[in-house]
Amino acid sequence: MGQKIHPTGFRLAVSRNWASRWYADNRDFAGMLAEDIKVREYLKTKLKNAAVSRILIERPAKNARITIYSARPGVVIGKKGEDIESLKKELAVRLGVPVAVNIEEVRKPEIDAKLIADSITQQLEKRIMFRRAMKRAMQNAMRLGAQGIKIMSSGRLNGIEIARCEWYREGRVPLHTLRADIDYGTSEAKTTYGVIGVKVWVYKGDTLGRNDLPAVETPRPDEERRPRGPRRDGRPGGDRSGAGRGPRRPAAGNSAPADGSDKPAGAGGADNTAVKRVRKVAAPAAPAADVKGE
């Protein structure tokens, strides 16, 4: 049974980049990675209502720089920047180094996989039907320029006793194409009857390199077909529709016989009378006459 590899990890260093960009020695790597995980969990809880798409953590020399991509940057900044200042102080205490926080706005949250998954889970927690939430998200994504989207929900859907998985897809989502810009996001809905997981794949086109380059829209196969041009040898051959042609001449050996039989008629006017060959067999010799008298 084929399994789906993580689209972001599959495309690292090809069309995607790492979410944590720093280098460390072997003895410091585990501690710094644990700090990154704790910082992401803290920001996920702190900025739950800010529609955070992703968090980029960079560590220059004895400093830290955190970039938060949010669809609602005003919620992160707060009134007169009060919230972001308190956020900087808290992150500096957790990391132990001075922290610079940058806020980047997500222009189209409808085609961001993480924000789509979070939106669906919020609707599921409000007891909205999962099919309605999934199809509405797919329609919005395709309307705003996505070339394909796939959404999968797993768990006790609608509160049934046996968990199952349902997915819907619109457009095309090429998971094996490395140059395809596939945005992938997951989220969990904590309902009264259990946890429901949501996965979202969004295909935005083909990229020329890293994800900071613009996506290239790939034409469909039916759009690539072009009308035929003139022949190289000068003979007319561009229009093959058959307009202006006369009636076709019957082939020499394919005309039906006049007698209505199913055998093809022979070419030319030769006599087609069948000749039956008979093999001559020698007659048996007569018995010798009896010369004795009576």
From Swiss-Prot:
Gene Ontology biological process terms in this record: translation
Superkingdom to which the source organism belongs: Bacteria
UniProt cross-references to NCBIfam families, sorted A to Z: rpsC_bact
Function (record text): Binds the lower part of the 30S subunit head. Binds mRNA in the 70S ribosome, positioning it for translation.
Subunit: Part of the 30S ribosomal subunit. Forms a tight complex with proteins S10 and S14.
UniProt record similarity statement: Belongs to the universal ribosomal protein uS3 family.
Name of this chain's protein: Small ribosomal subunit protein uS3
Organism from which the protein derives: Verminephrobacter eiseniae (strain EF01-2)
